Amino acid sequence: MAQKINPLGFRLGVTQNERSHWFAQQRNYSKDLREDQKIRTCIENYVRTHIKSSSNYGGIARVEIRRKIDLIKVKIYIGFPNLLLIEGRGQGIEKLRNDVLNMLDSVDRKLHIAIEKVAKPYRKPNILAEYIALQLEKRVPFRKTMKKAIELAEREEVEGIQIQIAGRLDGKEIARVEWDRGGRVPLQTIRARIDYCYYPVKTIYGVLGIKIWILEE
């Protein structure tokens, strides 16, 4: 039988690196892990509600978190940085930092947030998934959306991409799974640099699940 496994965890330490860098005692591990999830959720919600790009979606590729005793360093990799999120050009980062600190409810720790622009945003599965979700919310046909997403990725010179959408597609009564692929995506090879994301999107017909695998050069 085939075994399902997360492609990022499968390659951790070989071609993928950790998104969180810290050590904790056993009694504090679950607390810090939940805090990491809260920080990522707070950043994503802030970008979606306050900082809209010209493409009408946030474009967060990934969020890396590093912890020290009294300092939390957060680096946001974003595809389409708004001027408010560029350091020294607005109050966006300061407001985001205050929102995260209020959410953590901690006064004895410092928080540093840095922004880094992604050179080729459509090589990142999270940004492509957000683009697909936006099109599905606008009731664009899912096959047309998948082909357009593959075209955008191929313009960024990816070696291969696979997209899968599951749910009540086009409002049909029976849920199903549809997928499309461009290039090669060897999921069984650990040495292949596969980037992956899962992105749920709410539509008027229900929740659709988007999965994207991208083979980097």
Swiss-Prot record:
Domain KH type-2: start-end pairs: 47-119
Residues in the signal sequence: none
Location relative to the cell: Plastid, Chloroplast
Pfam families, A to Z: Ribosomal_S3_C
A GO term for molecular function: rRNA binding
Domain of life: Eukaryota
Coiled coil residues, start to end: none
InterPro entries hit by this protein: KH_dom-like_a/b, KH_dom_type_2, KH_sf_prok-type, Ribosomal_S3_C_sf, Ribosomal_uS3_bac-typ, Ribosomal_uS3_C, Ribosomal_uS3_CS
CDD domains per the UniProt record, alphabetical: KH-II_30S_S3
GO biological process: translation
Any single GO CC term annotated in Swiss-Prot or TrEMBL for this entry: chloroplast
PROSITE patterns: KH_TYPE_2, RIBOSOMAL_S3
Protein keywords: Chloroplast, Plastid, Ribonucleoprotein, Ribosomal protein, RNA-binding, rRNA-binding
Family: Belongs to the universal ribosomal protein uS3 family.
PANTHER family the record matches: 30S/40S RIBOSOMAL PROTEIN S3, SMALL RIBOSOMAL SUBUNIT PROTEIN US3C
Quaternary assembly: Part of the 30S ribosomal subunit.
Identification of the protein by name: Small ribosomal subunit protein uS3c
Originating species: Pinus thunbergii
Biological classification of the source: Eukaryota, Viridiplantae, Streptophyta, Embryophyta, Tracheophyta
